[in-house]
UniProtKB/Swiss-Prot annotation:
Induction: TNFRSF10B is regulated by the tumor suppressor p53.
Membrane topology label: Single-pass type I membrane protein
Name of the protein in its database record: Tumor necrosis factor receptor superfamily member 10B
CDD domains documented for this protein: Death_TRAILR_DR4_DR5, TNFRSF10
InterPro entries in the cross-refs: DEATH-like_dom_sf, Death_dom, TNFR/NGFR_Cys_rich_reg, TNFR_10, TNFRSF10, TNFRSF10_N, TNFRSF10A/B_death
Keyword Transmembrane helix among UniProt keywords: yes
GO-annotated biological processes: intrinsic apoptotic signaling pathway in response to endoplasmic reticulum stress; negative regulation of multicellular organismal process; response to endoplasmic reticulum stress
Function: Receptor for the cytotoxic ligand TNFSF10/TRAIL. The adapter molecule FADD recruits caspase-8 to the activated receptor. The resulting death-inducing signaling complex (DISC) performs caspase-8 proteolytic activation which initiates the subsequent cascade of caspases (aspartate-specific cysteine proteases) mediating apoptosis. Promotes the activation of NF-kappa-B. Essential for ER stress-induced apoptosis.
SMART domains for this protein: DEATH (SM00005), TNFR (SM00208)
Parts of the chain on the Cytoplasmic side: 202-381
Subunit architecture: Monomer. Can interact with TRADD and RIPK1. Three TNFRSF10B molecules interact with the TNFSF10 homotrimer. In the absence of stimulation, interacts with BIRC2, DDX3X and GSK3B. The interaction with BIRC2 and DDX3X is further enhanced upon receptor stimulation and accompanied by DDX3X and BIRC2 cleavage.
Cellular component GO terms, alphabetical: membrane
Keyword Transferase: no
Amino acid sequence: MEPPGPSTPTASAAARADHYTPGLRPLPKRRLLYSFALLLAVLQAVFVPVTANPAHNRPAGLQRPEESPSRGPCLAGQYLSEGNCKPCREGIDYTSHSNHSLDSCILCTVCKEDKVVETRCNITTNTVCRCKPGTFEDKDSPEICQSCSNCTDGEEELTSCTPRENRKCVSKTAWASWHKLGLWIGLLVPVVLLIGALLVWKTGAWRQWLLCIKRGCERDPESANSVHSSLLDRQTSSTTNDSNHNTEPGKTQKTGKKLLVPVNGNDSADDLKFIFEYCSDIVPFDSWNRLMRQLGLTDNQIQMVKAETLVTREALYQMLLKWRHQTGRSASINHLLDALEAVEERDAMEKIEDYAVKSGRFTYQNAAAQPETGPGGSQCV
């Protein structure tokens, strides 16, 4: 018996060879993981598209508008279908605002039996319903139309019943009182207006109002006459002074002020312009407007002169010229001095008065007959 060698199979090996069945080998672990990942990808591709857009299953009114990446929003009266905007059906459904992804329009409202159609539904507006005649819609319960109430025997109808408001009634006593009051007011108002018109006509105030409208009303109605009244008082005092020989010549009895007159006795237009040039250096800038209002110019005239004057320093001179042209020959240096005193610019008044006398163009009244020792009479320090 030969011993088994490397090339001679043993009996057990031969037996295993007889029972061996060819088939699949067991898969390695790595290939098993790859197969599992591929299976998950297939399942995701199958099920996710089915549930990705649940908005199509909701009613049109509850769908959220979603941005369409391919185009802008659909206009009112349209809805989005297959990427295109399509119109709603007239009288059936509508959309009142622009939308991005509504896949259907909103159905129009159908009016209930107790209401009638006020405005029919179109592609952009829903149906508007209102209550039938004899009924009204209460604000607290608008879904139901209620019957209009009737006024009792002791009441009068104040407002009639409308589809949106009930009838309002008021007692006959109160109604009679209001009716009488309305009649009295209707009678008295024309009478008062007529009496007022007659008073305005008889007093001549309408002429002043007409002049005020043409020239522009002043802020203070009394300021226009203040300078003239002051000058009239001074002239009256001067007349009394002439008849009183015991009073110092050239001074008034009441105030002690003196009137300035041109030396040559002629028209003082050039002399006034000479004084106007000096005023721009003496009168403070903040007092220019008040001074001109005191002299009688309106705010509109003041602003117009300022706008037309290029150099600020020339504005007062131009305003004084405007006043002189408007006043005419009655304008005098005494008006200017009175106005300066009225606006509390006494220092400027005294300097201008002293300058006018020293210039030789003006002198105090009656100074030629009885000259005073000092230059210009009395000078204030």
